[in-house]
Amino acid sequence: MSRSTPLKKVRNIGIAAHIDAGKTTTSERILFFTGMSHKIGEVHDGAATMDWMEQEKERGITITSAATTCFWKDHQINLIDTPGHVDFTIEVERSMRVLDGAVAVFCSVGGVQPQSETVWRQANKYGVPRIVFVNKMDRIGANFYNVEDQIRNRLKANPVPLQIPIGAEDNFKGVIDLVTMKALVWEDDTKPTDYVEKEIPAELKEKAEEYRTKMIEAVSETSDELMEKYLGGEELSLEEIKTGIKAGCLSLSIVPMLCGTAFKNKGVQPLLDAVVAYLPAPDEVANIKGEYEDGTEVSVKSTDDGEFAGLAFKIMTDPFVGQLTFVRVYRGCLESGSYAYNSTKDKKERIGRLLKMHSNKREEIKVLYAGEIGAVVGLKDTLTGDTLASEKDKVILERMDFPDPVISVAVEPKTKADQEKMSIALNKLAQEDPSFRVSTDEESGQTIISGMGELHLEIIVDRMLREFKVEAEVGQPQVAYRETIRKTVEQEYKYAKQSGGRGQYGHVFLRLEPLEPGSGYEFVNDIKGGVIPKEYIPAVDKGVQEALQNGVLAGYPVEDVKVTVYDGSYHEVDSSEMAFKLAASMGFKEGARKAGAVILEPMMKVEVETPEDYMGDVIGDLNKRRGQVNSMDERGGNKIITAFCPLAEMFGYSTDLRSQTQGRATYSMEFDHYDEVPKNVADEIIKKRNG
């Protein structure tokens, strides 16, 4: 069976945006204009086709990235919906891995907002080419040129408008296409229609010329050939301009900008044309890196030939077909009814049915080809980030990094009978979302759930009720504290026991040194002359690692330490791995007590947007919460306050902020780094922990 769409004509794109930039509406209109969904879902009524989970409908925010296939001008576009809320950055990271290009949607009034910066950073990290769509041009205060400045100054990118708006706010009529120098006008506001090409209005001729010159300059810098032609005063042909824009877009040296209003159906068709013209096909992006079990690196080229290799990037539970695993095929093809090899887990998986998803309908298919995205039904052991490959070529594609959770709460089912249902539900949800963890508190026996923020955990509890019919009581949020040391110390420890027959003997000298924040744990073997035989060294490492689980101050995990074993002794008969493990563990604990141990807490980057009248109250309140105000800006007549605040002080912040500002301020918060807790607060934490 051969493929219906050639690889060159496949586009895997995501629509990434800040929470209210109109991302879902833009996705909806794309699906509408590509002829897949006939009634446009409006987010305001909570009926968008992409937002297929109940809570999203209520909250009006998009949570899970669903992959949807649609067609435009004989190209297959796989649309991966990415969430716009900070607590779901893991979802964004995950979709960035499998995208080849992105459409960044900005609100023409709000411009570059904090979440847009986070999403932009992630797109830079994965080298994703993108085009910008400035949406909501019909809103009061719409300003295309402001957004252009913000992209340049805040995101440090090089925006190149390919269109400029005709009018703004209520007078927004359409756009001037700077490539063809034609005005594209939408004459009917109420229903989706095609645009009409007209001559450029006289009052905009000069501005259009100025912006076209800027565009041509940017394009000419993408190759020596075009530069020579441009400097020689020759006109660039239409084809050359388009090739130059694409080259600049793929090398991330330029970001093409378009504008419109998705809600009023203006500007969507030219956006689709730009996706097809300027965003990359799967074989136009860098090959994905992989490695074999022995560590040899390999580069995996996107092609139908060669052994199958794909990445499972998302797991969802579907009420009708059970568990769906979304897979992006990088090489070869995947057939339903065949077998694939999970090279991350070393397990064989049977491929059941294969589905191409439309946001809420599904089409059964026989084969997924290179560059395509689809869902597999019935995989047993495959989790997010696992590689599926052929048994003949067990490549492991580069793994995804998932952040550690920063907040935990205890959950208990309302009725004892629900205990088992609750653990099944939580395990299913943890499979879907690698940034969500479930554990049991050893002392109290309570079930603890941990995640990236309050909203993240609220939604988990909500999904337990809706999807699994388990009602849960939720405890007080707990912060994920850590411990570390501040001084370098050397510590000797001898573990020797003699109780009839064979004794136990382990003797180590350890050096404990503080590392830079975020470095984790480093172990160094500096034993000379075999004073400790090398078969015992792993036991020393293991002993230290066990001691790291419970710090000496309040029993929190210890991080950012380097431990060197540099001397010691052993006994021919009595030494054992166990003895060295215990010596290292106790030696580390003793050393840590002298090494200036401190408690660390997660610091959140908080951005509050508030009318000026309330600014004093907001800053005063942040200071009360031990926050450090970092910067103050203005945006659209409001004040923007950026601060670092300890997570421990931020519980219930949304309610407090609402009452301080009569509901007129908004905020966003994401984890930034760990920082030392002030002594008085640390004493309280220790007292509480140690009873």
Swiss-Prot record:
Keywords: Cytoplasm, Elongation factor, GTP-binding, Nucleotide-binding, Protein biosynthesis. SUPFAM superfamilies: EF-G C-terminal domain-like, P-loop containing nucleoside triphosphate hydrolases, Ribosomal protein S5 domain 2-like, Translation proteins. Residues 8-283 form the tr-type G domain. One of its GO terms (cellular component) is cytoplasm. GO terms for biological process: ribosome disassembly. Its main location: cytoplasm. InterPro entries: EF-G-like_DII (IPR053905), EFG_II (IPR041095), EFG_III (IPR009022), EFG_III/V (IPR035647), EFG_IV (IPR047872), EFG_V (IPR035649), EFG_V-like (IPR000640), G_TR_CS (IPR031157). It comes from the Bacteria. One of its GO terms (molecular function) is GTPase activity. It is found in: Cytoplasm. It holds the Pfam family EFG_IV. GTP binds at residues 17-24, 81-85, 135-138. The keyword Protein biosynthesis applies. Gene3D superfamilies: 3.30.230.10, 3.30.70.240, Elongation Factor G (Translational Gtpase), domain 3 (3.30.70.870), P-loop containing nucleotide triphosphate hydrolases (3.40.50.300), Translation factors (2.40.30.10). Catalyzes the GTP-dependent ribosomal translocation step during translation elongation. During this step, the ribosome changes from the pre-translocational (PRE) to the post-translocational (POST) state as the newly formed A-site-bound peptidyl-tRNA and P-site-bound deacylated tRNA move to the P and E sites, respectively. Catalyzes the coordinated movement of the two tRNA molecules, the mRNA and conformational changes in the ribosome. Belongs to the TRAFAC class translation factor GTPase superfamily. Classic translation factor GTPase family. EF-G/EF-2 subfamily. This is Elongation factor G. It comes from Campylobacter jejuni subsp. jejuni serotype O:2 (strain ATCC 700819 / NCTC 11168). The gene is fusA.
